[in-house]
């Protein structure tokens, strides 16, 4: 009896010591031992943090499960933190690790030498392959022209936006990665885009994300329960994506000409050959596959989703859509697709794209960062292993920086003469050391695709259709628009 009581007391003391809140953290919620304070499922996490901001201020601690999270709710804090080396890692989240089969590979979720090596390599190769240059613009314009022809088959009837939009965006990434494209009617291409969408969506599941914040659950949860929570579905999707990558890698290995690399995959395979005797090299087939998957995941779903958001807002604000079309008509001759050369003459259109980015905040809490050592921020101490979350929506709706923070107002990005102006406080591609490697490509795609679409079509809501622009509380990472119906009308 006494022994049992002593063991219980010892357990209580151990839990207390392990659960003790580190000194110097920002104010906020600590919660219970082992479980912290879990967020509500009925409200988006970003909205729950906004409520906490009213009580605790712009820098907030919230222990979710056993993870110490620090949320940053203004631009200066976000810029300062994400520029620090100490805050440049990604957390070892379970959902992140599933993409690398438990390994620290790729470029989006990796850290240290792995991340630095592949980020530099990708930026150099994409620059050489034409990111931001006319060579790549021609490929995007070809996809835009094909998309215009495809959309003509879907006019004058209520329907969801065609999936061919996703495939057109995907083809741009395929061109860069493997010098490949699908017809917009191709069943395999459409299946691949749907697989990307489904896998990204599955990654956001609330139940599955419990393992990110309660890692001890992995040790006690039976496999059948894990599968019910979404592990098998996500893992199967990742494996299927990897199988696609394997096929193209094998084809490129068979046709590789080291003197004439035609795409990113060739460049990787050549570099892999050159470093095969280097024991410190991070280049191997598994890593190449992971990096290519990162490019598809980050470069396809985000851009196609922003096209869908933009069309939704232009349906909701038809006067903005009409003004853009008048601007395009005045700058671009009919029968000629808009190009980057017309950018200076399409200031209102450019401003509208940026305003959709601002009002939507596609990744409301940014992609999680992680402290790789103890550091200080705004007078507070962030211990090693702290998850750092950037509340980009707070940055994008801060009345200190935006004239009409809660309204859709393209004039946020226009000066007094009606010319487009960049705003430093728009951080939709993040900021600091891990700013998105594909920012230039994404901006080019959005400009070319949307200008071509709006030059040729008008989008309106069917009678009685309610257009929802609020976030889905079940989505932990991205903010996808709710499904909507649209009527596409060809312009004369």
From Swiss-Prot:
Heme binds at residue 436. The keyword Repeat does not apply. GO terms for cellular component: endoplasmic reticulum membrane. Pfam families: p450. Gene3D superfamilies: Cytochrome P450 (1.10.630.10). Its EC number is 1.14.14.1. It catalyses: an organic molecule + reduced [NADPH--hemoprotein reductase] + O2 = an alcohol + oxidized [NADPH--hemoprotein reductase] + H2O + H(+). GO terms for molecular function: heme binding; iron ion binding; oxidoreductase activity, acting on paired donors, with incorporation or reduction of molecular oxygen, reduced flavin or flavoprotein as one donor, and incorporation of one atom of oxygen; steroid hydroxylase activity. SUPFAM superfamilies: Cytochrome P450. It is found in: Endoplasmic reticulum membrane; Microsome membrane. PROSITE patterns: CYTOCHROME_P450. Keywords: Endoplasmic reticulum, Heme, Iron, Membrane, Metal-binding, Microsome, Monooxygenase, Oxidoreductase. The keyword Hydrolase does not apply. It comes from the Eukaryota. Its cofactor is heme. Its main location: endoplasmic reticulum. It is an enzyme of class 1 (oxidoreductase). GO terms for biological process: organic acid metabolic process; xenobiotic metabolic process. Efficient in catalyzing the monooxygenation of benzphetamine, aminopyrine, benzo(a)pyrene, progesterone, and testosterone. Belongs to the cytochrome P450 family. This is Cytochrome P450 2L1. It comes from Panulirus argus. The lineage of its organism: Eukaryota, Metazoa, Ecdysozoa, Arthropoda, Crustacea.
């Amino acid at each position: 009896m006494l022994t049992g009581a002593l063991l219980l007391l010892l357990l209580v003391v151990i839990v207390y010591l392990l659960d003790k809140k580190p000194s110097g953290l920002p104010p906020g919620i600590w919660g219970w031992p082992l479980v912290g304070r879990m967020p509500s499922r009925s409200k988006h996490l970003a909205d729950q943090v906004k409520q906490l901001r009213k009580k605790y201020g712009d820098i907030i601690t919230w222990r979710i499960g056993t993870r110490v999270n620090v949320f940053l709710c203004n631009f200066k804090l976000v810029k300062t933190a994400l520029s620090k080396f100490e805050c440049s890692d990604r957390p070892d989240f379970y959902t992140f690790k599933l993409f690398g089969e438990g390994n620290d590979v790729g470029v989006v979720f990796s850290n240290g030498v792995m991340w630095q090596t592949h980020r530099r390599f990708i930026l150099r190769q994409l620059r050489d392959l034409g990111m931001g240059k006319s060579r790549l613009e021609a490929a995007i314009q070809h996809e835009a022209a094909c998309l215009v022809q495809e959309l003509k088959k879907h006019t004058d009837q209520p329907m969801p936006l065609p999936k061919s939009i996703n495939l057109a965006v995907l083809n741009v990434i395929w061109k860069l990665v493997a010098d490949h494209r699908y017809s917009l009617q191709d069943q395999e291409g459409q299946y691949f885009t749907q697989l990307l969408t489904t896998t990204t969506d599955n990654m956001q599941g609330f139940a599955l994300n419990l393992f990110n914040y309660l890692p001890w659950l992995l040790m006690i949860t039976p496999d059948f329960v894990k599968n019910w929570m979404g592990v098998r579905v996500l893992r199967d999707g990742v494996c299927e994506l990897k199988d696609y990558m394997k096929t193209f890698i094998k084809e490129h290995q068979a046709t590789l000409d080291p003197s004439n690399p035609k795409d990113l995959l060739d460049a990787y395979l050549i570099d892999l050959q050159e470093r095969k005797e280097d024991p410190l090299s991070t280049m191997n087939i598994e890593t190449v596959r992971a990096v290519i998957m990162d490019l598809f995941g980050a470069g396809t779903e985000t851009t196609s989703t922003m096209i869908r958001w933009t069309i939704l807002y232009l349906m909701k604000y038809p006067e903005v859509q009409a003004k853009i079309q008048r601007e395009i008509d005045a700058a671009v001759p009919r029968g000629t697709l808009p190009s980057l050369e017309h950018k200076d003459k399409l200031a209102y259109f450019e401003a509208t794209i940026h305003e959709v980015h601002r009002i939507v905040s596609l990744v409301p809490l940014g992609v999680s960062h992680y402290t790789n050592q103890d550091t200080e921020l705004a007078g507070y101490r962030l211990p090693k292993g702290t998850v750092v979350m950037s509340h980009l929506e707070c940055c994008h709706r801060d009345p200190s920086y935006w004239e009409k923070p809660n309204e859709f107002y393209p004039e946020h990005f226009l000066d007094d003469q009606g010319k487009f102006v960049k705003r430093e406080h728009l951080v939709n591609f993040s900021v600091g050391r891990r700013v998105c490697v594909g920012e230039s490509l994404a901006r080019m795609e959005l400009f070319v695709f949307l200008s071509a679409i709006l030059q040729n079509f008008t989008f309106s809501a069917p009678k009685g259709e309610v257009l929802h622009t609020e976030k889905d509380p079940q989505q932990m990472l991205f903010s996808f628009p709710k499904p909507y119906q649209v009527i596409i009308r060809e312009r004369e």
